[in-house]
Amino acid sequence: MKKSVKRKFGHERGIKYRKKTGDITRKKRLYFMMFAVFITMFGLCGRIFWIQFIKGEWLKKMAYEQHSMDRFFNPCRGTIYDSTGEKILAVSGSVESITVNPVNIKKDDREKLAHKLSDLFQLDYDNVLKKISKRSSIETIVNKIDKDKSNELRNWLVENNITTGVNIDVDTKRFYPYNTMASQIIGFCGVDNQGLMGIESKYDDELRGKKGSITKLTDAKGGSLENEGEEYLEAQNGDDLILTIDATIQGIAEKYLKEACIDNKCTDGGNIIIMNPQNGDILAMAGYPDYNLNNPYIPITEEANEWDSLSKEEKTKIQQNMWRNKAISDSYEPGSTFKLITASAALEEGITDTDNTSEFNCGGGITIGGVRIKCWRYYRPHGSESLREALMNSCNPVFISLGQKLGVKTYYSYLEKFGLLSKTGIDLQGEGGSIFLNENKVGPVELATISFGQRFEITPIQMVTAVSTIANGGNYIKPRVVKKIVNNNTGEVKEIQSEIKGRAISEETSKKILSMMESVVSEGTGKNAKVQGYSIGGKTGTSEDGVNTGKYVTSFIGVAPTDNPQIVILITLYNPTGEGGHQGGGVAAPIASQVLGEVLPYLQVKKNNDEGNEIKKVKVPNVIGLKFSDAKKMLSDSNLNIDVPENTDENAIITEQIPISGVEVFEESNIIVK
């Protein structure tokens, strides 16, 4: 009995256990299924949310693009004006472009259409036929065609009953009314209307505008749907630019620069920068050789005659050279023009003054750190000099001694104040920088050469900006080329303000330097820069282009008028090889006289009161082959001075003269003979 009860109890307990276990299993399955359903629903909801709210716009766009076709057309690129706002330097004209929708062109029309397009636009027939026969929605045939040709195509399409598949859309093409004028400043555009060089590139975002479009609904194959209209989105034209460049002054600078480069056989060209020192405006920036903006890939120099025979590499080299704006991108040794910076620093620091008689003595050279550095006129030393006389004579030893007194740290602080250790920040593409030794590597000899403008390099724009700092009373002003941006859609005008970066020297020092610069032109090495009726200040410069290259850079920096500076002009000629030599006073200074002689009256700058004392020019006689005594008399009869080596024998025969005979110079100019 006990056993039976036990078995019964055990049996019931087992049944209850199995029942309990089964219940748990069913619950687990139920929970698992509920969890799985929850996860699935959560995932589906998440996916729906992702599709609807996160990727919804993108998917809608993709779906729309699958059954629509866009044809884009360019906006009218902004116009570029000169400083007057009247002369147009760059403008976009209306042309047209041809595209096709291959899926909408009937097979029977393809060959004759390809023949017409290839003949009319001088294209390769096979290439055109290949485009027309593609299974694509749109192909470009040709861009920027004249309207007479597009009208001819329109008439042909009507005559041949081709009503779909060929699109003639409005486009724009860039035109440059003055062809070569300011080519290296303005730059040019590519076939897609994107600026590639100069201002066109620097201000591309402002000039380009926003493209417009024509949208059509299409079927699955890309064909146009009948009875469906087009959606037209108007293009937004680009902004206009008003430059600081004055087209008249630019033309004057380019005219005389070209003449000078050709007459003096400047193998590496030249440039002229004219700047308003009071506000940093670049009034002109001429470079030679230049190029035609309407055909920028072909040179206009003698190289054009052999263009087709040149290799791709040779063509690229020539193009890069003519496109490059050397006035801002290339560095050079400024030579004696840099003595203005040394003199400014020395005067500002109070270690010298302009007219201390016999303060300096030129013995033909000076020894620094065991190295003998000669004066350019070592053969007949200048002797006792004041600072004014030293600048007039361009005497190297005087400026070397000033540099030594200033010391490296102080000298470099003035280089920084004059903006010579960094780029100017001019709003043009491709500005280069200066090349100076690190301050901690400059010893006495290095400082000596820097003091008279050698063994370092700066860009022409840095030099003209530094001298503009002297001319305006001591403020360093950032140069600029664009002064206004005009929004074509709203009419809003944005003024680009002049930016004063800091003070380099005092007004007192500025006046002293300007006074000495005037003496350089009236009595010193810059006599050939004189302009009747105006007070002109300046400094000549000659330096070697590289070390032992045999090439020279000739320059002149000028200020006019010195009593109220409105112009700073820098003329730089690279490797003049003509008979006139390579001295700044004989080659570059006369160009300044020509340019300023036209620019100052154009700007209505008043003449001074000594207009009655007419400055006459005379032709230099030929004294080669004469005795020194005879040459001296001949030059004196022409109101010219002779510059001869010290202790020259009166009976010695002259074998060289600078400038050569026939060159016109002002009376009282020095003629160097050897």
List each model region and its residues.
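Periplasmic/cell-envelope proteins involved in peptidoglycan metabolism and beta-lactam response
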Residues: 1-305, 331, 409-419, 529-530, ...
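Beta-lactam-recognizing serine transpeptidase/beta-lactamase-like catalytic domain environment
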Residues: 7-8, 89-90, 219-230, 278-337, ...
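Short aromatic-glycine motifs in intrinsically disordered, low-complexity regions
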Residues: 68-69, 172-173, 526-527, 541, ...
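Extracytoplasmic
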Residues: 73-78, 92-95, 136, 163, ...
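Structural motif
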Residues: 82-83, 368, 531, 623
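Residues at or immediately flanking beta-strands
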Residues: 165-167, 240, 269-271, 357-359, ...
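Glycine-centered C-terminal helix-capping/turn motifs at helix ends
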Residues: 208, 352-353, 625
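Ligand-recognition elements built from short beta-strands and adjacent flexible loops
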Residues: 533, 571-674
